[in-house]
Structures are given as structure tokens and as C-alpha cells.
């Protein structure tokens, strides 16, 4: 019986000979709230794994130690927001910093410790097995921060409106049943008068705007309620908070406008479009956002049906204006999580749903796709056909995928979008159906004959 061949016993830290080290000067960092665990290649330091605190001085000391260990590239997981300060400091020292998805770095069960985690990251990065996450340029990151803050403020203002509505309902003031929005001109005027101490329903009804359909008598009847001191106190505070958030939203809009004007332009300054109406909803910026976005991107993305100016703003703040980060439009759609994630085993597709990604741009595209349900454009007709065939959820994803590809082509190649209209789309679809029916008939040794020829 032949003896089994003896295998050479690997020493600690020795790599598998079947893998080729692409990044020999790589370090791995396990990011945490209070401590960061850092691993460097074996032999660079008597203690290749060290722990550093999260204070700024500790982060600078970490960067200096990595320099002393001749490290050139660093990898870390995108853990909450703990990695951001560390990323910026390491980048200022000249390191190539890679931020990876934690789902792509999972190790075996039962081997999850901080020390093993940073060593595992360092090993994976050494062999080039990790993909760096997308991080937009600095000016896009600043814009994204402003827009996310504005979104938080709008959400907080909406919460205040809900609190005011709840308080009115508790006092049986049925104002919301006669006007469509209590945060409009009429609603806010009445609320401010109530907070100021006015209880006469006839006088409160005089604040009715001309565009409100309900009569003054109907509004006066809806304002007959059970005035309670504690609920009026809640109403007053909710109104004050709402005014504060509206003020902060306006300040945020000014900051966004200033930053947009400093961003690189791809077009010559254009003549300003129509001014923003004073009665515009609070979600709409108080400056001409469309012209600024056209100047930055070089194209007018709002020509695409479903893409409103704020949708375009959200997409740009998440993906930027440089489409060269994705080689093809398919890669762009895959990054957004808008394409099938096929799981194949044994020659069979086990799962074909989309990947679960947390991406505000993808969410904005899905909302834009759903807004096409009543659009009289070619995209609207296409979406309604997909909805009847696939159902709403799949149709929304499919149309969001199509919108993403259109945005990619327009921003990368500078092409303008021309909507051919619903009639042109229906005509083209009818021709495709006729061609398919003729092919099916030919396969059965039959022939299609128009109904007019039969009757004649």
C-alpha cells in the first residue's frame, strides 16, 4: 500500500501558494466605536496586530504606525459612520483606502473576534478579493450631506403637521375635512389665529382663501370644537416647531444653492427659467434648481418622463455626474440593485430576484417609475403594459432599470432625450405583435390575412 505523500506544514502567517498576492503592503482594520484593530503583514512589526483608540490623536498615531510598517493600501468595513473620520485621516496621509461591504467579508462561523476580523480583512485585501465601494467626489459628498439634512428637516416638519392634525381631531375640530391641506395658506392662517386666542368660528372662517372650494359657513361649522387648554398648548408648540423647521429648510436651500454654483459646469450659463412660485410646497426648493442641474450635468434629465427636478437632484447627489466609474449601463443598473440577482445551482435558476441594497438613487428611480402610471408618454405606455403583464412590483423595478439606463446614456454621452409619444409607442408595439403572429402562423403552415381583405 502506497504511503500518503507528506505535505509541508505551513507556518503561521504563510499564504496559500495557489493564490497570488496583489497587494503585499496591505493592512486590514476592524472599525469600532471606541477601538480600532489593525493588522499589518507578518514581519513588519513584532506585534502585527495592534489596537488604537477612536480619538483624533489615536487615529494620527495609527497612520504613523502604518507608515512605519511600509503599508500602502488599507481596507476597512463600512461600519455605521465610524469609518468616515478614519477614512479622511488615512487618505490625508497618502494611503489608498478601500471601504468594503461587510457582507462581502464574512468568515467562518465561530471565528468572529476583533483580532481575527482585521487579520481576515488584511488577508483578503492582500489577494485582491475585495471590491472597493463607490464613493463620489468631494463636491458630490458635500451636496449629498446638505440634501440628506434637508430631507430630515422636511420629514420633521411633516411630523409636526401630523401632531397638529391629531390635536385638532382630539378637540373635534374637523378642519381637515373641508380643506385639503392644513399646512396651506388657509389652514395655517386659521391655526395661527387659534393659537393667538381666537375662538369665534365666524371670524376664523374669514381667513378662507379664494381658491378653497368650501364655503365660509362650512368652514365655520368644522371649527366648532371642544377647546381644551392642554391640547391648545400642544398645538402651539407643534406650530412653533413647524415654523422653525420651515425656517431651517429655507436656510438649507440657500446653502445648497451656494454649493451648486461652485460645482464644475458642463454647460455655459443659461437664461433663468420661470421663477419659483411663492405658494410652492415646502418640499420644493426656493431657487431655480433645474437650471443649476442642467449646468452641472450638461443635459436636461427632466425631459425624461417621470424624472422631476428633485428626483434628478437626489440621483446626482448619490451617484455624481461622472459615469466612467461604471464601464457599462448594465454595471450601473447592477450597482443600483435594479437587475436580477440570479442564483444558479445544478443548471437551474434557484432565485432571480433583485439584490437588497440600501440606495437612495434606486428608491428615487422606483418612485419615478410609479409616477408614470398616468403619463401620456412612451415610457408611460410601456410601464402600463409591463404592469398588466408582470404586476406592479416587477413592473416598477423593470421601469426603474430602464430609467437608470437612460440616465447613464444621457450623462455619459451627452445625448438628449426625445419622447416619441404614446401613439408612436403603441404603433411600434402593434407592429411587433403582428410580426410575432406572422411568425407563429408560419411555423404552423398558416398565413395571416387582414380582415379587410376577407370582407372585400
Ranges and model annotations:
Residues 1-456:
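A detector of single, family-specific signature residues
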Amino acid at each position: 500500500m502506497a504511503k500518503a505523500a507528506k505535505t509541508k506544514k505551513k507556518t503561521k502567517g504563510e499564504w496559500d501558494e495557489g493564490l497570488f498576492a496583489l497587494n503585499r503592503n496591505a493592512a486590514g482594520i476592524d472599525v469600532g466605536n471606541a477601538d480600532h484593530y489593525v493588522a499589518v503583514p507578518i514581519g513588519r512589526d513584532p506585534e502585527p496586530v495592534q489596537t488604537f483608540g477612536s480619538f483624533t490623536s489615536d487615529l494620527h498615531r495609527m497612520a504613523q504606525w502604518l507608515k512605519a510598517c511600509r503599508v500602502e493600501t488599507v481596507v476597512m468595513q463600512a461600519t455605521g459612520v465610524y469609518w468616515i473620520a478614519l477614512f479622511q485621516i488615512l487618505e490625508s496621509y497618502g494611503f489608498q483606502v478601500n471601504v468594503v461591504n461587510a457582507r462581502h467579508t464574512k468568515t467562518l462561523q465561530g471565528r468572529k473576534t476583533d483580532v481575527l476580523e482585521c487579520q481576515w480583512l488584511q488577508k483578503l485585501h492582500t489577494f485582491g478579493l475585495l471590491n472597493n465601494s463607490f464613493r463620489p467626489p468631494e463636491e458630490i459628498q458635500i451636496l449629498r450631506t446638505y440634501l440628506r439634512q434637508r430631507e430630515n428637516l422636511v420629514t420633521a416638519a411633516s411630523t409636526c403637521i401630523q401632531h397638529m392634525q391629531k390635536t385638532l381631531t382630539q378637540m373635534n375640530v374637523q378642519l381637515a375635512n373641508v380643506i385639503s391641506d392644513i399646512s396651506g395658506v388657509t389652514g395655517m392662517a386659521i391655526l395661527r389665529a387659534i393659537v393667538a386666542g381666537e375662538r369665534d368660528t365666524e371670524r376664523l372662517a374669514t381667513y378662507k382663501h379664494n381658491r378653497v372650494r368650501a364655503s365660509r359657513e362650512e368652514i365655520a361649522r368644522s371649527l366648532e370644537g371642544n377647546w381644551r387648554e392642554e391640547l391648545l398648548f400642544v398645538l402651539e408648540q407643534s406650530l412653533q416647531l413647524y415654523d422653525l423647521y420651515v425656517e431651517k429648510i429655507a436656510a438649507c436651500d440657500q446653502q445648497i444653492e451656494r454649493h451648486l454654483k461652485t460645482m464644475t459646469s458642463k454647460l455655459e450659463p443659461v437664461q433663468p427659467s420661470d421663477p419659483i412660485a411663492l405658494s410652492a410646497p415646502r418640499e420644493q426648493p426656493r431657487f431655480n434648481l433645474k437650471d443649476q442641474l442642467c449646468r452641472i450635468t450638461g443635459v436636461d434629465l427632466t425631459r425624461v418622463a417621470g424624472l422631476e427636478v428633485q428626483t434628478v437632484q437626489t440621483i446626482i447627489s448619490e451617484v455624481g455626474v461622472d459615469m466612467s466609474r461604471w464601464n457599462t449601463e448594465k454595471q450601473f443598473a447592477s450597482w443600483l440593485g435594479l437587475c436580477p440577482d440570479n442564483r444558479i445551482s445544478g443548471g437551474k435558476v434557484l432565485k432571480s430576484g433583485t439584490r437588497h441594497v440600501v440606495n437612495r438613487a434606486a428608491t428615487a428611480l422606483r418612485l419615478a417609475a410609479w409616477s408614470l402610471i398616468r403619463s401620456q408618454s412612451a415610457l408611460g405606455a410601456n410601464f402600463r403594459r409591463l404592469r398588466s403583464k408582470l404586476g406592479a412590483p416587477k413592473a416598477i423595478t423593470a421601469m426603474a432599470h430602464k430609467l437608470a439606463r437612460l440616465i447613464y446614456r444621457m450623462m455619459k454621452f451627452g445625448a438628449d432625450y426625445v419622447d416619441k409619444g404614446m401613439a408612436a409607442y403603441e404603433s411600434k408595439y402593434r407592429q411587433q405583435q403582428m410580426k410575432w403572429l406572422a411568425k407563429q402562423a408560419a411555423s404552423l403552415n398558416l398565413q395571416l390575412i387582414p380582415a379587410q381583405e376577407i370582407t372585400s
